[in-house]
């Protein structure tokens, strides 16, 4: 498929540095630099312009429910993804619809990373009304059509198959979150522990 040229992946995410507020954002922020050491990576995110990614404002349709505005950003992402990509990889319901549409539009596989699931957040129905119905629909539709789903744990894999029992279990793979050992490693210094009153 790629001969001697690097694979080209478009990562679709709502969160990307410097705007990160949850685990999926941390995951993508750690994943992309590692992927870029191996392959070519395009990043499409939501929000304000930033270095290393193409950002899409969540402002259309103006004044609409947040889910509709996320879909507006999704459509903008699909249009901005380079024609040369070999695969699209979406994270969370915010970009799962973009991944589905981009896969169809560019005729490439769509892979989803499962961080959380809308069916496991029923309280959002009361908070978001129709927006929750839309986010749930987008997630289910994207999962049903995805070429592969990556669960970040065995527990998440079980949750995906429980929430979406029609999925082929062979399409749902576990790839645990990695750890950057340059950043996270054992230390022998105890100054910080003492400074906060903790017995090292």
Where do the protein language model's features map onto the residues?
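Carbohydrate-associated surface elements
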Residues: 155, 178
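A short, charged, and often flexible helix/loop element on the N-terminal side
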Residues: 50-81, 126-127
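A short helix/loop element that forms part of the nucleotide-sugar donor recognition site in Leloir-type
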Residues: 185-198
């Amino acid at each position: 498929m790629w001969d001697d040229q690097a694979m080209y992946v478009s990562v679709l995410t709502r969160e990307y540095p410097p705007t990160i507020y949850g685990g999926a954002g941390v995951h993508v922020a750690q994943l992309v630099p590692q992927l870029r050491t191996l392959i070519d990576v395009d990043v499409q995110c939501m929000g304000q312009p930033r270095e290393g990614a193409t950002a899409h404002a969540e402002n259309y349709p103006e004044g609409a429910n947040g889910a509709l505005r996320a879909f507006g950003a999704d459509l903008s992402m699909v249009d901005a993804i380079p024609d040369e990509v070999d695969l699209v990889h979406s994270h969370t319901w915010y970009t799962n619809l973009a991944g589905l549409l981009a896969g169809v539009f560019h005729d490439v596989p769509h892979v989803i990373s499962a961080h959380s699931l809308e069916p496991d957040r029923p309280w959002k129905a009361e908070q978001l009304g129709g927006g929750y119905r839309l986010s749930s629909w987008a997630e289910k539709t994207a999962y049903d059509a995805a070429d592969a789903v990556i669960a970040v744990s065995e527990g998440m894999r079980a949750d995906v198959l429980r929430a979406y029992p029609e999925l082929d279990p062979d399409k749902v793979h576990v790839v645990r979150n990695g750890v950057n050992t340059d950043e996270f490693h054992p230390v022998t210094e105890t100054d910080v522990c003492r400074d906060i009153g903790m017995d090292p």
